[in-house]
């Protein structure tokens, strides 16, 4: 390729310029570069003329390989855009090649070429022959002129067929070119090229069947494709018959039959008729008269069934030909001595089976079967009368003396029809041979011996030599018993009595058997003759004996008939079963053998396929490598040639030879080319720069020299312009004066006609004034009418507009009234709902107040009873302090001695006033938050789905009853106990302490026990518990904090919480199941988990727990005994996991809406919430400790499992601790510590779905969670 790139239009102009000066090769190179260029791979309109010019040059220069490469490139360019352009280009290319070949043929006198193969024009034999014999001028002219063009045309056909194969878009063009190639072979008698063309077409068809998955592949199931292929194959068959290439014709027949098999629909009758006609010719030329006749039979039946316009003459001609062809089939079997010796019967049978398949027959035909079909279909009635009796003479009648004379008449008639029926002449020799054979068969049945001259006189249409040859062939192939005696010139028949005829001996007219047949059947004939004689001469006694024997036989038969019948049936059944068993065994064995053979064949086939695949892969790899090498060499050569064309490139590569291309590297060539381009660019820049300087100097000098000249020329031009202006001005003044004089003359002449003009105008106005007044009057009348009409229409329109406006206003008023009515009804309904809610709130507050009063009284009674029981217990336990001395000796392991006082945080507070102040206003609202409503299903009211603790009162609990009838424990509180009451006597929840800041109770993940009413001493709820609600349906919880509290909806129909505030209540869910925030009245500060307790004492651990502001980890004092130790530890681990931020927007933390501050929106309960909660937790904790002491006293001392645990100590030590605690002054409550911390309890749902939160704490300790 050149260093520069040309546009296609410029390349075409450049090529035409080369052609004008007679340079075809440079023009071809220019067009070749454009076609090979990768920058124009998209088809454009200019590509077609470029390609036509390129192919024209290829034809003129006979460059078939360049034409092939260009066509392939053009196919890639236009295949997806304009395939019609490719068709036009290919047709134009072939047309040019054909015209050039025809021109060369006209100039040459050689009509038929003597060259066998155009691919190998000069064979060694032809070279030697030309050297020995020499050649004249004409022969040399023919060889140099016609042969190259014929070869070029053949290569053009072959290249175009390879280009267009297996492409559905150009399928029609492909078949047209194939048919043109057949005509070319027929025109120039190119047999070798015809064979190659047939092989190529067969190979292309195989490729179509293999590569049918390609995008442009031909679909052989398409009827149009099948018809085009059949048409091409029929042309091939016709050409092969014309060129007498019978082997190729037979292959074409097989190809046509294969196409028939591919087609799902039957072929057209016209196509099948043409096919049968061609096949019959092929069979006759191959010497197979049997299948030739069978083909004519098929053609005859097809014509009778499908042709509606079949004339009587055509039917007569076809039936006559079928009759002659059938009778012309040789009577003797077509088998030579060599075939008999080599045992080729199987091969012959297989050949006949294949030929029968080509005709669509299930089994091969025979001569006798064809004759029977001819008789069965009554074909003889359509035969011409001259030939009609030929069948009877040869196949039915037995008349040897007149046979040849009758047949001679028919043969003479056939010869006379040579001009009309030329196809019938080919049957005459075969009919003569069959007639001679029939004559010999019939003569052999009559005569024992006959003279040769006598026999020759019976066969007038052959000479003696042919007759003798026929006799010998009949004796050898036809089982004819004949001997020729040349000494006496006689023939003897049936002289060999030991001769036995074969099974396939021909059958014909029969009179009697031969002597050998009589000798072979002599005993049978003698037996039948003797039986007849005995029947004639035997006496009556013999007949009577025979009758008696017959009667005895009948009697015996009747006696044993049934048994014999059963035996025969049984034997038949046995035979059938045995045959079936043998047959099944044979079938099974054959099946196994078949499977084994198939497996072996499959294995061999797979191995062969794998081998072929590997070989193909290796060949493909080798081919790709060779192509890459060739492309590399070609690229190196092209680049080297391009660089050498330049001056610098010639200097750089002057020492490199083209033959050394294998050692060159394309990168090296590219580097050289780039270097050469850079040098050229630099040289050009320097040259331009020097020229620029020269031009600048020259231009400056030139302008300096021309300045005075320009001034001088300017002055001269100015003087000339002034003179010209003065001259023109004088001429203008003179012309104006002349024009004024002419105008004055014209005015004087026209003024004389002014009077006539005035008179004419006055007459015209007088005549037309009346018409004007009439038209004006009519116009005024029409104007008045039109004005009235329009005013009336305007009035109607205004009236219609007012009516529409009135109705529209009326509808709007009605709509407004309806909306006001709906608004009033909605406001009234909201007012009634508000009143109802307020009434329910007042009733709820009243009921709550009564319940609080009742609970207060009950709590006082309980305190008095518990105090009394405690004192009795202390008095009873006092004498038993000494035996428990051993428990006090382990102080170093964390147990407190009896003499020690209780810890400060357990010591009761002396005065009771500070515990009770403000209690009346807070106690019941707090109760509302600490108690949950009645829950259906019997499950625990406080425990969630993730509660891992056991039941508080399980069936396997070994502790004593809580408050049974036989419980001897004293009451929990006395009358002087100033602590707040627990919610029930046997509340089994973990005790709360004064500094206990655990999170609020929750629904699903709360691990604390359920709270109970005052008088409920039952265990926790279970799944099958059918007890009543915890607090009854008169739930005494406080009212909701506000109208817009965003708590969740009610849980069910039996929910006894306070009423909803209205239809627009947007509160969140109740805090029983999924409320993740703390409840009102609880301490919102989180607890801090402790580590594993060390070896210190009880007070040290309690002090550490108090400092951590969290519940104890290792000393959980609840009523579950030792079974709670592991649970407490696991709960300590889960506390860390559940400490996460609660969902934002929970308005229960702020006491109202979430928008304002906490002080303005909190309710009346929030002021002293924390003091009351801390007191209540401390009271419940003390009550739990006393109950545990009583239980331990009953069970006796236990062996401590964990020295660091405080829940295993005896009751005596704990009583001492409680005494010390009561005597010690109370610790100041740290109620405001860690007020900014938030509760971090989480439910399982919260653990699974963590959310990003932001917590804010106000002055009162309320935490607001924002999203």
Curated annotation (Swiss-Prot):
Positions of region (Disordered): 792-1267
Sequence repeat locations: 956-965, 966-975, 976-985, 986-994, 995-1004, 1005-1014, 1015-1023, 1024-1033, 1034-1043, 1044-1053, 1054-1063, 1064-1073
Segments of skewed composition (Gly residues): 1150-1159
Compartment(s): Cytoplasm
Residue numbers spanned by region 12 X 10 AA approximate tandem repeats of D-[DE]-[DE]-R-[GP]-[GPQT]-R-R-[GPS]-[ADFGIM]: 956-1073
Chain ranges of the PCI domain: 315-498
Residues that span the membrane, as ranges: none
Keywords from the named record: Coiled coil, Cytoplasm, Initiation factor, Protein biosynthesis, Repeat, RNA-binding
Ranges in a coiled coil: 82-118
Cited SMART domains: PINT (SM00088)
Superkingdom as given in the UniProt entry: Eukaryota
Pfam family, one: PCI
Example GO molecular function: translation initiation factor activity
CC annotations in GO: eukaryotic 43S preinitiation complex; eukaryotic 48S preinitiation complex; eukaryotic translation initiation factor 3 complex; eukaryotic translation initiation factor 3 complex, eIF3e; eukaryotic translation initiation factor 3 complex, eIF3m; multi-eIF complex
Feature: compositional bias, Basic and acidic residues: 792-835, 844-1086, 1098-1147, 1162-1256
Primary localization class, coarse: cytoplasm
Biological processes annotated in GO: formation of cytoplasmic translation initiation complex; translation reinitiation
Function: RNA-binding component of the eukaryotic translation initiation factor 3 (eIF-3) complex, which is involved in protein synthesis of a specialized repertoire of mRNAs and, together with other initiation factors, stimulates binding of mRNA and methionyl-tRNAi to the 40S ribosome. The eIF-3 complex specifically targets and initiates translation of a subset of mRNAs involved in cell proliferation.
Oligomer and partners: Component of the eukaryotic translation initiation factor 3 (eIF-3) complex, which is composed of 13 subunits: eif3a, eif3b, eif3c, eif3d, eif3e, eif3f, eif3g, eif3h, eif3i, eif3j, eif3k, eif3l and eif3m.
The family this protein is said to belong to: Belongs to the eIF-3 subunit A family.
PANTHER family assigned: EUKARYOTIC TRANSLATION INITIATION FACTOR 3 SUBUNIT A (PTHR14005:SF0), EUKARYOTIC TRANSLATION INITIATION FACTOR 3, THETA SUBUNIT (PTHR14005)
Stated name of the protein: Eukaryotic translation initiation factor 3 subunit A
Species the sequence originates in: Danio rerio (Zebrafish)
Gene of this entry: eif3a
């Amino acid at each position: 390729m050149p260093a520069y790139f040309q546009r296609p239009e410029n390349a075409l102009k450049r090529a035409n310029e080369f052609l004008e000066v007679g340079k075809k090769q440079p023009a071809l190179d220019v067009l070749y570069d454009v076609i090979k260029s990768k920058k124009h791979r998209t088809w454009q309109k200019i590509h077609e003329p470029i390609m036509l010019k390129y192919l024209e040059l290829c034809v003129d220069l006979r460059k078939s390989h360049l034409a092939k490469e260009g066509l392939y490139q053009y196919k890639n360019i236009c295949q997806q855009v304009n395939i019609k352009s490719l068709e036009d280009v290919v047709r134009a290319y072939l047309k040019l090649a054909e015209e050039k070949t025809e021109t060369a043929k006209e100039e040459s006198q050689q009509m038929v070429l003597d060259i066998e193969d155009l691919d190998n024009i000069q064979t060694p034999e032809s070279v030697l022959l030309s050297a020995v014999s020499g050649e004249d001028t004409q022969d040399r002219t023919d060889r140099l002129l016609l042969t190259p063009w014929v070869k070029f045309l053949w290569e053009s056909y072959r290249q175009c067929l390879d280009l267009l194969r297996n492409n559905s878009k150009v399928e029609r063009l492909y078949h047209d070119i194939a048919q043109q190639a057949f005509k070319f072979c027929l025109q120039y008698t190119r047999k070798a090229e015809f064979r190659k063309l047939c092989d190529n077409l067969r190979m292309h068809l195989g490729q179509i069947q293999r590569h049918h998955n390609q995008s442009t592949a031909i679909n052989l199931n398409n009827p149009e494709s099948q018809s085009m292929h059949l048409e091409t194959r029929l042309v091939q068959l016709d050409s092969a018959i014309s060129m007498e290439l019978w082997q190729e014709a037979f292959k074409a027949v097989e190809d046509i039959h294969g196409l028939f098999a591919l087609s799902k629909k039957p072929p057209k009758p016209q196509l099948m008729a043409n096919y049968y006609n061609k096949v019959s010719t092929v069979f006759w030329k191959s010497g197979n008269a049997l299948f030739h006749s069978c083909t004519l039979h098929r053609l005859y039946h097809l014509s009778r069934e499908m042709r509606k316009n079949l004339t009587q003459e055509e039917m007569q001609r076809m039936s006559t030909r079928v009759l002659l062809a059938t009778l012309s089939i040789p009577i003797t079997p077509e088998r030579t001595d060599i075939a008999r010796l080599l045992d080729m019967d199987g091969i012959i049978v297989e050949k006949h089976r294949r030929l029968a398949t080509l005709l669509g027959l299930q089994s091969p035909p025979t001569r006798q079967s064809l004759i029977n079909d001819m008789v069965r279909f009554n074909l003889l009635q359509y035969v011409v009368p001259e030939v009609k009796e030929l069948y009877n003479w040869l196949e039915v009648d037995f008349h040897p003396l007149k046979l040849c004379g009758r047949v001679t008449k028919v043969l003479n008639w056939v010869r006379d029809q040579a001009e009309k029926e030329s196809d019938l002449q080919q049957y005459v020799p075969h009919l003569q041979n069959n007639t001679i054979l029939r004559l010999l068969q019939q003569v052999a049945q009559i005569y024992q011996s006959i003279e040769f001259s006598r026999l020759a006189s019976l066969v007038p249409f052959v000479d003696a030599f042919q007759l003798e040859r026929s006799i010998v062939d009949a004796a050898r192939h036809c089982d004819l018993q004949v001997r020729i005696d040349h000494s006496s010139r006689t023939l003897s028949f049936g002289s060999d009595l030991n001769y036995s005829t074969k099974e396939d001996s021909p059958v014909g007219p029969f009179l009697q058997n031969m002597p050998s047949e009589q000798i072979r059947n002599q005993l049978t004939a003698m037996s039948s003759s003797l039986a007849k004689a005995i029947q004639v001469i035997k006496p009556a006694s013999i007949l009577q004996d025979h009758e008696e024997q017959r009667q005895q036989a009948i009697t015996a038969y009747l006696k044993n008939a049934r048994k014999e019948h059963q035996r025969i049936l049984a034997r038949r059944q046995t035979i059938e079963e045995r045959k079936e068993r043998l047959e099944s065994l044979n079938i099974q064995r054959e099946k196994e053998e078949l499977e084994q053979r198939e497996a072996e064949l499959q294995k061999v086939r797979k191995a062969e396929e794998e081998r072929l695949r590997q070989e193909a892969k290796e060949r493909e790899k080798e081919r790709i490598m060779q192509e890459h090498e060739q492309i590399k060499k070609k690229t190196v050569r092209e680049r080297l040639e391009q660089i050498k064309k330049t001056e610098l490139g010639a200097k750089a590569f002057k020492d490199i030879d083209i033959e050394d291309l294998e050692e060159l590297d394309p990168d090296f060539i590219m580097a050289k080319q780039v270097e050469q381009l850079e040098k050229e660019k630099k040289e050009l820049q320097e040259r331009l720069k020097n020229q620029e300087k020269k031009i600048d100097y020259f231009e400056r000098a030139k302008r300096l020299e021309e300045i005075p000249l320009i001034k001088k020329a300017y002055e001269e031009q100015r003087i000339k312009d002034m003179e010209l202006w003065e001259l023109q001005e004088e001429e203008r003044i003179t012309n104006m004066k002349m024009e004024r004089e002419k105008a004055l003359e014209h005015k004087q002449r026209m003024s004389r006609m002014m009077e006539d003009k005035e008179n004419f105008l006055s007459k015209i106005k007088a005549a037309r004034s009346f018409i004007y007044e009439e038209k004006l009057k009519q116009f005024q009348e029409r104007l008045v009418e039109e004005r009235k009409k329009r005013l009336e229409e305007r009035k109607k329109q205004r009236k219609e507009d007012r009516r529409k406006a009135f109705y529209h206003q009326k509808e709007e008023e009605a709509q407004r009234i309806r909306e006001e009515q709906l608004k009033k009804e909605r406001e009234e309904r909201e007012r009634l709902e508000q009143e109802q809610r307020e009434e329910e709130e007042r009733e709820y507050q009243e009921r709550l107040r009564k319940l609080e009063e009742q609970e207060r009284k009950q709590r006082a009674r309980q305190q008095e009873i518990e105090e009394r029981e405690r004192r009795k217990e202390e008095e009873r336990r006092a004498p038993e302090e000494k035996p428990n001395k051993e428990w006090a000796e382990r102080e170093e392991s964390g147990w407190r001695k009896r003499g020690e006082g209780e810890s400060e945080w357990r010591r009761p507070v002396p005065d009771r006033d500070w515990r009770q102040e403000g209690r009346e206003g807070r106690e019941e609202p707090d109760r509302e938050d600490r108690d949950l409503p009645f829950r259906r299903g019997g499950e625990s009211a406080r425990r969630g789905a993730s509660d891992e603790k056991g039941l508080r009162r399980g069936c396997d609990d070994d502790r004593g009853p809580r408050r049974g009838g036989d419980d001897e424990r004293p009451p929990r509180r006395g009358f002087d106990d100033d602590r707040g009451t627990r919610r029930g006597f046997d509340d089994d929840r973990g005790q709360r302490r004064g500094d206990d800041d655990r999170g609020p109770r929750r629904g699903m993940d709360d691990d604390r026990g359920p709270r109970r009413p005052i008088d409920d001493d039952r265990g926790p709820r279970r799944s099958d518990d059918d007890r009543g609600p915890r607090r009854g349906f008169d739930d005494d919880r406080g009212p909701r904090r506000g109208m817009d509290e965003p708590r969740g909806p009610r849980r069910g129909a039996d929910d006894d919480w306070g009423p909803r505030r209205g239809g627009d209540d947007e509160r969140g869910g109740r805090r029983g199941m999924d409320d993740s925030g703390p409840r009102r009245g609880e301490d919102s500060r989180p607890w801090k988990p402790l580590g594993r307790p060390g070896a210190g004492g009880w007070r040290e651990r309690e002090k550490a727990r108090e400092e951590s502001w969290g519940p104890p980890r290792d000393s959980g004092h609840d009523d579950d005994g030792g079974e709670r130790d592991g649970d407490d530890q696991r709960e300590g681990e889960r506390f860390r996991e559940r400490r996460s931020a609660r969902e934002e927007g929970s308005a229960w933390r702020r006491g109202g809406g979430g928008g304002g501050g906490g002080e303005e929106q909190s309710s009346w309960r929030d002021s002293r919430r924390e003091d009351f909660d801390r007191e209540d937790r401390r009271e419940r904790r003390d009550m739990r400790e006393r109950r545990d002491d009583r239980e331990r006293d009953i069970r006796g001392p236990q062996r401590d499992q964990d020295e660091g645990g405080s829940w295993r100590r005896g009751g005596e030590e704990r009583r001492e601790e409680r005494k010390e605690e009561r005597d010690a002054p109370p610790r100041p409550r740290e109620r405001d510590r860690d007020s900014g911390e938030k509760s971090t309890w989480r439910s399982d749902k919260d653990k699974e779905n963590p959310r990003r939160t932001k917590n804010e704490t106000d002055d009162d300790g309320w935490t607001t969670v924002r999203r």
